[in-house]
Regions:
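Acidic, surface-exposed loops and disordered segments
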Residues: 1-120
Length: 120
């Protein structure tokens, strides 16, 4: 059911071995979005360390094909308490393909600034 939580970018959940819904309580922390984002990326780093693949599915501020807020859809699907907010779902499983790292020659180093913005 979670594979329908967004109008695009969540259909692969139907084949995922594992889906981790990342939640936070906005009443407990004013930086809940940042905290949940850190938790999401740490899940992805741990999956990679285990030789697994992962994909972040953004839920906050997204909508289903029917226009229902994705967070509301996930709340109803999993009976999540109302005070908790859904930031993301991290799908984990065996990698469908191995991506090559970016070639350093093609990195946009002009977007990296040291000491001050615009300083060379």
């Amino acid at each position: 059911k979670l594979s329908h939580c967004k109008n695009m970018g969540s259909s692969f959940l139907k084949d995922a071995a594992l889906a981790i819904v990342v939640l936070a309580d906005p009443l407990a922390s004013d930086v809940w979005i940042e905290d949940a984002a850190i938790a999401s990326i740490l899940i992805q780093l741990q999956a990679e360390d285990l030789g697994l693949g992962s994909c972040w599915i953004q839920v906050r501020e997204r909508f289903t094909e029917e226009g229902i807020p994705s967070g509301e859809f996930v709340h109803e699907a999993l009976d999540i308490p109302l005070q908790l907010q859904v930031l993301s779902i991290v799908a984990v499983g065996h990698k469908g393909m191995e991506r090559k790292p970016f070639n350093e020659e093609h990195l946009q180093w002009e977007k990296v600034h040291l000491h001050k913005y615009g300083a060379e």
